[in-house]
Each structure stands twice: as structure tokens, then as C-alpha cells.
């Protein structure tokens, strides 16, 4: 398992554990606590995870995914800029 996969796995596990359990008297389904979801991620890691999930159409509300799928990520733009100089 690569480091990105293992960190992604840990994040998904954390999100699963963040789900509020349903008690017999509670109305509606279990929901993620919006205050804690994806705010713990650092910029670089969030960029990698969100880029992957946006391409698959997952986690749009957490990642602020662009509408276009062929948008070049900031990471690639930085790499191209540094090679051009």
C-alpha cells in the first residue's frame, strides 16, 4: 500500500468514525459533523485527495471541485512554471 493510499484509508476511517450514531429516538439518518469534516487536512494532502476524488465525482461539497474535469491542477502548473524558468 502506497503512502497516499494508506493516508486516504486513514482519512476515510476517520470520516466513518465521525458519523453520529443513530439512537432509537433520533429522527433521520446518521450524518457527518460538518465542523470536523475535511478541515483537518493540510493544504498539500487535501489537494492530492481532492484532486483524485473530484476526478471521480466524489466529495464535491468538501473539496470545492471545479466544474471542468480537464482543469490542470495547481501542482502541475507549479511544476511547469519551474521547468520553464
UniProtKB/Swiss-Prot annotation:
The modification Aspartic acid 1-amide is found at residue 67. Keywords: Amidation, Cleavage on pair of basic residues, Disulfide bond, Gamma-carboxyglutamic acid, Neurotoxin, Secreted, Signal, Toxin. One of its GO terms (cellular component) is extracellular region. Residues 25-38, 68-85 form a propeptide. Expressed by the venom duct. Residues 1-24 form the signal peptide. The modification 4-carboxyglutamate is found at residue 47. Disulfide bonds: none annotated. Its main location: secreted. GO terms for molecular function: toxin activity. It is found in: Secreted. Contains 2 disulfide bonds. The cysteine framework is XIV (C-C-C-C). Belongs to the conotoxin J superfamily. Causes scratching in mice. This is Scratcher peptide. It comes from Conus geographus (Geography cone). The lineage of its organism: Eukaryota, Metazoa, Spiralia, Lophotrochozoa, Mollusca.
Amino acid at each position: 500500500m502506497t503512502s497516499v493510499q494508506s493516508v486516504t484509508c486513514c482519512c476515510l476511517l476517520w470520516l466513518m468514525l465521525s458519523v453520529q450514531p443513530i439512537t432509537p429516538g433520533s429522527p433521520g439518518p446518521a450524518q457527518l459533523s460538518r465542523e470536523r469534516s475535511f478541515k483537518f487536512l493540510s493544504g498539500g494532502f487535501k489537494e492530492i485527495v481532492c484532486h483524485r476524488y473530484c476526478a471521480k465525482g466524489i466529495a464535491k461539497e468538501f473539496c470545492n471541485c471545479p466544474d471542468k474535469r480537464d482543469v490542470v491542477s495547481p501542482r502541475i502548473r507549479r511544476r511547469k512554471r519551474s521547468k520553464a524558468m
